Amino acid sequence: MNKIYSRLAFTNIKNNKTLYMPYIISGMVMIAMFYVMMFLNNSRGLSKVPGADALASIMGLGCGTIAVFSYIFLFYTNSFIIKRRKKEVGIYNILGMEKRHIARVLSIETLTVALAAIASGIIAGILFSKLMIMFLYRIINIKAQINFTVSASAVVNTILIFGVLYFLTLIYNLMQVKLANPIELLRGGNVGEKEPKSKWLIAIIGLGCLAGGYYIAITTKNPLQVLSLFFVAVLLVIVGTYLLFISGSIVILKALRKNKKFYYNKKHFAAVSGMIYRMKQNAGGLASICVLSTMVLVVVSTTVSMYVGMEGELKQRYPADISVYSWYKEIPAGLKLDDALKEAEAESDKIIDGSDCDIKESKSYTYFSWTVCREGEEFKPVLNYNNDISMLYFVTRDEIEKMEPGLQGRLKNKIPKLDAGSVAVYGTEKFNNDIINLLSKEFKVAAAEKTAVSQDSYMSSMYSGVYYVVVDSKATLAEIFNLNSSLGEDSVPTMLNNEIDYNLYGSSEDKLAVAKALDKHFEENSVKSDVSGFYVESRDANREQIYVFYGGLFFIGIFLGTMFLMVTVMIIFYKQISEGYDDKARYEIMEKVGMSNDEVKKSITSQVRMVFFLPIILAACHLAAAFPLLRRLLVMCNLTDVKLIVICMCATLLVFVAIYYIVFKITSRAYYRIVGNQI
């Protein structure tokens, strides 16, 4: 008896290979991708690279994302298959098979599919794991010997997670058979449908959600809110997309039908009436295609932008090859800031002169900064970080050009001469008062202009406004700094910084050696000096970590983008099959009411194209609306090249549209095979 059930199960899979082969292949790819991600997450070699913790977090995020989307997608695909097979199951029931016998056949089918997908997926994952780790090493610029290994924990986790998934699909299938009577099963997916109603309220809510998501993406400027509101905007756009496809499309089509002049035209009559039913059946799937397409565009374009602009990001974050910082919590009595800075610079120059590097250029300056909240024309201490916070940089007139190169060239008026009681204020927003109050001491504002600020863009991206308060001398600078210290518990946490920046001639290895020598020297001598602390920052020392982090993001972006694209392709494929079965009957009906074969073909082909290209059009709109928010997120990652971001996004969109069109044309073959001689 068991042999009969097994033979019947294998025959069913073979007879429905058009449905099952894509299901097994997509499951295999999902499983292979999950195994590879688990393998990379557990890799001992990757645990030794600089920035390994960040890379592990990225890989962990990838594992979770693949698992979640695998469950969603494979459940969707399974539900489509079981819906199409209900008639077949109903015939078995009518012919005398009890539901428990049908359940046994379905169990064998599910077990066969699961074993085929899991086994082939793990084998493919193992075979491709070395290739993927080589690709990752190439991206993150790591040179290391790679041995072929198999991760036992990755294999076990993959079997457990996807074994549970296929078991849940079996439970779903058995429930569908158990709860349906034979007549319902025989009707399968051909149950008569009523004309969908115009649900204005749902359509308006959908439009409101979409408008709300767009508004947040376009108008959010507070850096502290960008990340949190990004997810709010994403949620609103997803909800809005589904509601608009489900209800908004019906509302628009019915409004067109009410326009008698438009509707009673042979070009529009069949198309509009057909689209009403077509959108009712396909709205959810089309919304899913739209959301997944948007995910592909956003994930790939942003990670590509970050990876391509990596050197620019590195130079933006670390403008000099080597920077030496020393700071003071309080200025010691009798300390002359100029003397302390010159002494530190002389010591640094001596160490560099004794190395294999030569000084290309250097600069040194003293400054301190305050985190404040601007209320009108006043700057007040930050009480909480929910406010729009700003950064004030205090620096002398003689050293402002060192800290902000090109500032004087950008100003309409040159920085005026200042005295001990006057300052100049330059920032991302203009300061309009003639007097500025700094910790209860008033200063006359000799000049104030709005100008671009590039200093420390990594930090600047976190603030709503960045301002330079330019003073006449270091004596005034020290006076204002000491005013802050005198406030006790009410003081604004800050440090007075001496910074020395070097650009050097020499190899990366030589520059790293200089940075280590400087770090060692100042660590040994910091106890003897009056400084509160110091550190040495090297662009080359941080290059590896930057490459690992952004390279890891690029890798995961391409990986997830590929997965989202595959899911999109499979949904399009199954939608084409669904359209084919539905349109086969539509062709017959439309020909019976007097339409010629050419008219029928033209009408239905235009409907199918409209249905399948609506998602990509709306996805492009989503990407355009998301651009301002994505740009701010990328600025927080030091990518300030807007032109590069636009080029990467446009290139990603063009490539995706081309792939989408090719997929549509290829999957259309399945549609035309089903429709057959009707066309």
Residue map of PLM features:
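Short cytosolic juxtamembrane segments of multi-pass membrane proteins
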Residues: 3-7, 179-193, 581-582, 672-679
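Short helix-loop junctions at transmembrane helix boundaries
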Residues: 39-53, 122-154, 211-228, 615-678
